[in-house]
Amino acid sequence: MAAAAMHTSAEFINLKPNMWKKNPVRASGSCCLGSSSGDEISRKRKLPILLFDVMDTIVRDPFYQDVPAFFGMPMKQLLECKHPMVWIEFEKGLIDEEELARNFFIDGRDFDLEGLKECMRSGYSYLDGMQELLQTLAADDFEIHAFTNYPIWYNIIEDKLKLSAYLSWTFCSCIAGKRKPDPEFYLEVVGHLGVEPCDCIFIDDRPTNVKCAIEIGMGGLCFENADSLAKDLSDLGINVSVPKL
């Protein structure tokens, strides 16, 4: 629940390394020369691996409309009253939800934590076309992981929307203790996967997060909507044919 950021930038939209333009998706192998014993493992995996941000990329984020309404105040007032760091600490798993409730507001006022969680749950929904796009990618045996800044409440999203039917909740900030765009978080991701950065494509609605992915060598796509993402993936050799995106 950080303050709203600029989500569009001509400088960062649809950034990707030139190699993805030149080389189609490979069913196996590693894109980087000189790999060691990891090659045998890589050859058994379908590449590239797809890393998806979740909020406002796959799932609607309730914070910008539903949460101000829940507290009965406009967004500007909410941002002025809210502690500037407590949600970030919650996303990094440094505090639990009880401490979030105690420190959410600068003045320490009480609020209905369970009501807020229900507000969030009610507001979670798939963005138009994204469930179908994920279903198509999963059916084509792509390896898909969530790579998200979100607290333990990702369990609420999973309970409602069942994203695990299409991806693994592998890289969550609340577990890693790090948030995008910290480069160390990205390096942990590729280290855990046992691949080179260039074997991954990262999709996120925030240009700063995409920029960091590209700087460490990943392919990067700045998400706008499901229709444009399907086109961008097709440009990279990943053909996504989803009706009525």
Curated annotation (Swiss-Prot):
GO terms for cellular component: chloroplast; chloroplast stroma. It comes from the Eukaryota. Disruption phenotype: No visible phenotype and no effect on flavin metabolite profile and abundances. Optimum temperature is 40 degrees Celsius for both catalytic activities. It catalyses: FMN + H2O = riboflavin + phosphate; 5-amino-6-(5-phospho-D-ribitylamino)uracil + H2O = 5-amino-6-(D-ribitylamino)uracil + phosphate. Its cofactor is Mg(2+). GO terms for biological process: riboflavin biosynthetic process. Its EC number is 3.1.3.102, 3.1.3.104. Optimum pH is 6.5-7.0 for both catalytic activities. It is an enzyme of class 3 (hydrolase). It is found in: Plastid, Chloroplast stroma. FMN hydrolase that catalyzes the dephosphorylation of flavin mononucleotide (FMN) to riboflavin. Can also dephosphorylate 5-amino-6-(5-phospho-D-ribitylamino)uracil, also known as ARPP. Not required for riboflavin biosynthesis in planta, but may help maintaining flavin homeostasis within chloroplasts. Homodimer. Belongs to the HAD-like hydrolase superfamily. DOG/GPP family. This is Flavin mononucleotide hydrolase 1, chloroplatic. It comes from Arabidopsis thaliana (Mouse-ear cress). The lineage of its organism: Eukaryota, Viridiplantae, Streptophyta, Embryophyta, Tracheophyta.
